[in-house]
Amino acid sequence: ANTDNFIYGSGSRMSMKNSLSLSEAALAELKANGTPAVVRLKVEPGQAIKINDLIRGEVVFQSDELDDKVLMKADGMPTYHLANIVDDHLMQISHVIRGEEWLSSTAHHVLLYRGFGWEDTMPAFAHLPLIMKPEGNGKLSKRDGAKFGIPVFPLAWPSANPEEYAPGFRENGFLPEALINFLALLGWHPEDDQEIFTMEELIQAFSLEKINKSGARFDYDKAKWFNQKYIQQMDNVSLAKLIRPYAESKNYTSTEDFLVEVAVLMKERVTFVQDFTEVGYYLFEPVRAYDQDTVAKKWKPELKPAFEGLITFIDQQEDFTSAPLEASVKTYIQETGLKAGDILSLLRIAMAGTMKGPAIFDMAAMLGKKETLERITKFVSAQS
């Protein structure tokens, strides 16, 4: 017989060995022998079980298609379905909000509420659409995190096997507020085109009834965009506090004022919190390597005397704040007949090792005269 679609329910229970099909004598004998038994929910036939889902509207289940769920296992332990209902009732849960894969179980849960006489205090149900894979085909899973190199959990998924360890959004440098904002817009959209919300704005605007029924594609680039925006909007003192643990993990000794300056210079250029110390490492330690493509295009041996003169000139500057220093150096470059584009590009490479990053003279002012001169001198020596 084909048992692939077998349902232990109203249509089959009398052909099974249970308390309804056996005689009282047979039941007594089984009990006397200590035969293990489960407790099932008896689903009555011919019922239309209606659920008013806050997202999907009215959903109807036919009881003839439902199985008699096991509520208590043979070892006396309750199953999820029983424990879930009792727990929610005792905790006075008002709303059950969960993924759509649980929708099929809701009919059984409604029957349990009715059976216990708790229908008047039954919570409202809302079944969220699935979060789909980045390519939009199928539900996002832990395996997709490993496949695409993206987080799929809020926090790290621990494992005794290092190969199975999965860092979460927190470990990847996401701000909680950014993640909440991103997730809120998966399947829901406000009445206007606003994307960035404070928590209070989200509370006021969000509505379960306006969530789409269809699944939403997981767009990791969009998640990163939200994180960038939240970092950019955060005040610098708060950012400095977030940067500190990353700086300390790399044994960088930094004052609060210094970390605030790091936040000011880098917040428009980073995606994740750890980028302040990884991408912007050159604000904490000497440059590790120079962008050789730029050096090859811009550096010429005859520039060495010009840079030596520039080093002497910079050393003579008493006002080492950004704007005056920039004006003085650019005037010096112009008066000595040097090519500003080449000199400034090479100065940037000397200071940061890359053409990307904060303004040259902002970095110089932050790092101070001594460190600035050491970096330029080291760079020039490396080209000899």
Task: Indicate where each model-derived feature is located.
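Long, amphipathic alpha-helical coiled-coil segments characteristic
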Residues: 294-329
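Active-site cores that bind ATP or allylic diphosphates and position pyrophosphate for catalysis
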Residues: 1-144, 151, 165, 190
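Catalytic adenosine-cofactor/nucleotide-binding cores of aminoacyl-tRNA synthetases and other
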Residues: 119, 124-290, 352-384
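Generic recognition of well-ordered alpha-helical segments
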Residues: 108, 112, 181-185, 346
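Short alpha-helical basic/polar micro-motif
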Residues: 94, 107, 177, 221, ...
